[in-house]
């Protein structure tokens, strides 16, 4: 049996196999030559003290002990060409992992995706960045892989209660992700690596007899006697099935409007909204690592911060070390920000959403929209930001200290946000109560993270798509919609996930529930 150890070591030891072997040999009092293999099981950074340490959990195999490298392999998928069909609406993580699970269970997924495949999306991303043109069906939110494909590929989830996180991570490794995601405390694939993984998943679905239909947008759900019968697409095609997984993501406003129009029960849901702050990565490194220079053995530093301000949570969201701010509008006439990092996180700046918890009462000015009140609140801020910044994909921007002092910034340096920025006093973008909380919150952040509150930091507005503004209620036991039999609201857009991993888990669960219902 291997010996398992928990230890703290210097970064230069953790990143050098020979130094680590030497260190461990002294810990267990054997010669380095007696150590056959070291498996790193978990890895995280402890930056609480000036002397930064790496936390490791390792398994040590000595000579003569049985060691066999664990090779992660794909499940044995059956061919489902002639199996019962299930419609999956949306090819984000919830939809794709639902499709894979359906195949494992012997069911045939028909995946429809309003956007283009990962390669086709790139042309539309260039158009929004360079030409300020928003394709309503193909953008940073819509298209193969969903919003996560081109917004970082973070795999961290706080909730272990949602399901088997390890299974999802191992499936991603089997489809090409680095095995590092299995051991890192905050695993991350990177926007440059994720598209190929997504493409490989799609090819497996097709190879097994499933269908994936791009540029195919849901325009109607066929319902009879409160049971689904199928769907209609924008092409006028009808696809019949009595099981539908609705995994359309947090930005599919037309789907929320369709459900509301058909009187399929939905409800407003609180979400969070604010700005995206960009700092020099070197500054964040110096704050987090308490040093002037990060060195070669440490990764670009992340940060996580939360404060209670006027009875509301204000916190960092989707923090991207060495990353880029992206334009994530899904319709003309609005601007939206988000962030992403390449796998090496090697860009010069760090960015993070800094957002405030909203309450249902905040949506009262939009009460006439009923369950869509939160969505209309969200939309109003995005449209106002678009107008204030010049009615292109430029975003309102302001230096951080200037914002806290209610001063328009005299100049805005070039940031990672490619379409560009316009100097705007952020108080004009947000309702007064949000502006006040943001101002007080940044001042408090500056007290907790010395150096964070600086005019080197540029705020971009708005960060508004943190989660869905609508929940599509479902039975907690069957996962079916409370009102419509055979309709399975799924993932982030339905209000049951927050990120790639939790969405993938929810997709698998919906597939399992469908199989269970068929067996009854």
Write out the residue ranges for each language-model feature:
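Residues forming the flavin
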Residues: 2-54, 58-150, 154-171, 175, ...
């Amino acid at each position: 049996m291997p010996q398992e150890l928990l230890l703290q070591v210097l970064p230069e030891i953790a990143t050098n196999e020979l130094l680590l072997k030497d260190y461990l040999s002294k810990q267990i009092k054997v010669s380095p030559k007696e150590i056959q293999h070291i498996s790193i099981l978990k890895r995280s950074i402890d930056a609480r003290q000036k002397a930064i340490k790496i936390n490791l959990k390792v398994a040590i195999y000595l000579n003569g002990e049985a060691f066999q490298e664990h090779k992660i392999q794909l499940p044995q998928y059956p061919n489902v060409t002639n199996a019962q069909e299930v419609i999956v609406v949306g090819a984000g993580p919830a939809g794709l992992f639902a499709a894979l699970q359906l195949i494992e269970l012997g069911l045939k997924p028909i995946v429809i995706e309003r956007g283009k495949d990962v390669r086709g999306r790139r042309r539309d991303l260039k158009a929004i960045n360079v030409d300020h043109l928003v394709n309503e069906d193909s953008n940073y939110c819509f298209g193969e892989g969903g919003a996560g494909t081109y917004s970082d590929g973070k795999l961290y989830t706080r909730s272990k209660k949602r399901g088997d996180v390890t299974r999802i991570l191992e499936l991603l490794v089997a489809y090409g992700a680095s095995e590092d995601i299995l051991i890192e405390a905050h695993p991350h694939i990177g926007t440059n690596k994720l598209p190929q993984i997504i493409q490989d998943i799609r090819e497996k679905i097709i190879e097994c007899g499933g269908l994936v239909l791009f540029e195919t947008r849901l325009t109607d759900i066929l319902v009879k006697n409160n049971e689904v019968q199928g769907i209609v697409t924008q092409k006028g095609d009808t696809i019949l099935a009595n099981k539908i997984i609705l995994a359309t993501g947090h930005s599919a406003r037309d789907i929320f409007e369709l459900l509301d129009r058909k009187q399929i029960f939905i409800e407003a849901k609180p979400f969070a909204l604010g700005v995206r702050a960009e700092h020099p990565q070197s500054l964040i490194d110096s704050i987090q690592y308490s040093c002037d220079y990060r060195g070669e053995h440490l990764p670009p530093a992340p940060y996580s911060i939360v404060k209670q301000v006027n009875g509301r949570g204000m916190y960092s969201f989707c923090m991207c070390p060495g990353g880029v701010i992206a334009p994530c509008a899904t319709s003309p006439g609005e601007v939206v920000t988000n962030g992403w990092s390449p796998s090496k996180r090697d860009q010069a700046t760090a960015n993070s959403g800094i957002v405030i918890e909203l309450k249902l009462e905040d949506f009262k000015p939009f009460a006439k929209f009923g369950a869509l009140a939160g969505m209309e609140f969200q939309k109003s801020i995005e449209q106002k930001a678009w107008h204030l910044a010049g009615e292109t994909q430029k975003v309102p921007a302001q230096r951080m200290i200037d914002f806290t002092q209610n001063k328009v910034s005299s100049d805005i340096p070039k940031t990672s946000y490619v379409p560009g920025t316009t100097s705007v006093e952020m108080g004009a973008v947000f309702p007064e109560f949000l502006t006040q909380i943001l101002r007080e919150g940044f001042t408090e952040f500056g007290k907790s993270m010395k150096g964070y509150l600086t005019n080197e930091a540029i705020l971009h507005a708005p960060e508004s798509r943190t989660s869905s503004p609508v929940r599509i209620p479902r039975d907690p036991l069957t996962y079916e919609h409370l009102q419509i039999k055979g309709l399975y609201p799924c993932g982030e857009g339905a209000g049951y996930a927050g990120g790639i991993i939790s969405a993938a888990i929810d997709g698998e669960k919906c597939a399992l529930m469908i199989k269970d219902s068929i067996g009854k």
